[in-house]
Amino acid sequence: MHSLSERVEQLRLNDCPDWLYLLHEFDALYRQGSDGGSRPIRTHRKRVRDSLALIVEANPAVNDRPPEVKPVTAHLGRALDLGERGAVQGMSRALARVAGRLTWEYGYEKVPKALARKYAYCEILGPRGPICAERLILGFVLFAPSTTYPQHSHKDIEESYISVAGAWSENDAAVHAPGSLILNRPGLEHRITTGDLSPCLLAYAWTGSEERLNQPGMKLSSPRKARIEKGI
C-alpha cells in the first residue's frame, strides 16, 4: 500500500501560478531593461533570459522548502511597499504574493553578529528550489538600512543584481537606485553599503556550471586580504 506522500503528484511550475508569474517578472527585467551599451552586460542578460526560457518551457518540479525568517525580514514589508512605488513595481507585487513561502538564509557557516541582524537572502529558482533548476539561480537579497556587507566574491559564478527598493553602493563606485543593474564577473571582490533611511531589496541572477551553483562556496574575504588588494 502506497503512503499518502507517494500518492501525491509532484507539483510542477505550471501548477504554481504565483511562482510562474514571479519568473515572468524576472524575464521582463532581463529582457526590457537597458544594457547601457555594455557588451558583457548584454551577453549576461541574454544568457539569463535564454536559460530561464528553457527552464520555464521544461515545466520543472516545484519543491516548497520550509519557510524561514531572519531578523532582517522584519524590513521586508517596508521594502515591498517602496518597490511598489518604484521602477520595478511588478516584481515587488509578485514577490509579495509568495512572501510567506520564502526561505531566508545567510549562506555562510559563520556570519558576523552585526551582519546577521541586517542581511539575508532567499533563492526562488536553483538547484535547491523551490523551483528546480541546475544552471541558473534566481533570488533576492535583503539589507536593513545602514548595512555594510563585507568584501566577498563568488568563484566561477557570474552574478547580476537589479535594485527593487532602496539605495545602495558597491565598492563606493556609484549609488544604485531601483531599476538599475550591476554585473559582477566571476571572482570579482565586492563590498556593499546601503542607505541609512530605507531597507534595500535586490533581485539577483547567478550563472555558472552546475557543479559550482550546487556548491557556491560563499565566503567572506579576510579584512587583511581586502586591505592588501586595495593597496592599504
Curated annotation (Swiss-Prot):
Residues where a divalent metal cation binds: 154, 159, 161, 190
Top-level class of the enzyme under EC nomenclature: lyase
The keyword Cytoplasm is assigned to this record: no
EC number(s) from the headed UniProt entry: 4.4.1.3
GO molecular function: dimethylpropiothetin dethiomethylase activity; metal ion binding
Role this protein plays: May cleave dimethylsulfoniopropionate (DMSP), releasing dimethyl sulfide (DMS). DMS is the principal form by which sulfur is transported from oceans to the atmosphere. The real activity of the protein is however subject to debate and it is unclear whether it constitutes a real dimethylsulfoniopropionate lyase in vivo.
Protein name as catalogued: Putative dimethylsulfoniopropionate lyase DddL
Species whose genome carries this gene: Cereibacter sphaeroides (strain ATCC 17023 / DSM 158 / JCM 6121 / CCUG 31486 / LMG 2827 / NBRC 12203 / NCIMB 8253 / ATH 2.4.1.) (Rhodobacter sphaeroides)
UniProt gene name: dddL
